[in-house]
Every structure is written in structure tokens, then in C-alpha cells.
UniProtKB/Swiss-Prot annotation:
Species name: Saccharolobus solfataricus (strain ATCC 35092 / DSM 1617 / JCM 11322 / P2)
Database matches in InterPro entries: PCD_sf, Pterin_deHydtase
Gene Ontology molecular-function annotations: 4-alpha-hydroxytetrahydrobiopterin dehydratase activity
Zinc-finger keyword on record: no
Family annotation (PANTHER family): PTERIN-4-ALPHA-CARBINOLAMINE DEHYDRATASE (PTHR12599:SF0)
Protein name as it appears in the record: Putative pterin-4-alpha-carbinolamine dehydratase
Coiled coil (UniProt feature): none
Amino acid sequence: MSGISSKELEELKINGWIVLENGKKIKKEFRFKDFKQSVDFLKDIQPSADALDHHPDVCVYYNRVVVELTTHDVGGLTDLDYKLAIKLDELYKMKTS
């Protein structure tokens, strides 16, 4: 497990991820048409998270899902956070296209 590069972090910021806690965590809000789409997205997160053995903190609201990523073991961001963030962005694009 390696740290996240500044280039990777910039890529995530361009895609709407917000850096929190002095670079120890990233957060993004995904917006949907309704609660069903929000819950469906949550269900889609699970296989990707399991495949990486890396699980996000998630809050589900009526028409949005807020995801926070960090690697608790190291107290900051790693390549696992980057990979899962990219995957979640891909899932979101597929769901909303």
C-alpha cells in the first residue's frame, strides 16, 4: 500500500473530490434523481469496495450519497483510496448517463 501522489490528488479534486483534514481524507457528494437511485448506488459501491478490501464511510440521503475515503490503518490517503474514488466516479457516470 503506497501513498497517494499529488498528481492523483489533483485529478480527484478536478473530479469533485474535496480534501479534508489536511490531506488525510477525501469526500464527494453524488446526486441522484430520487432515493431509489441513491440506494442503488450504495448497493453498487459494495462489490467494488469488497474487491479492494477497502470500505468507505457512506451517508445516504434522499437524493444524494456522501462518500468519505481514508485508510484508517495509516491515518491518511493511500492508493486504495485513489482506486476506489476512481471506481466510484465510473459507477456514478454509468448510473447517470
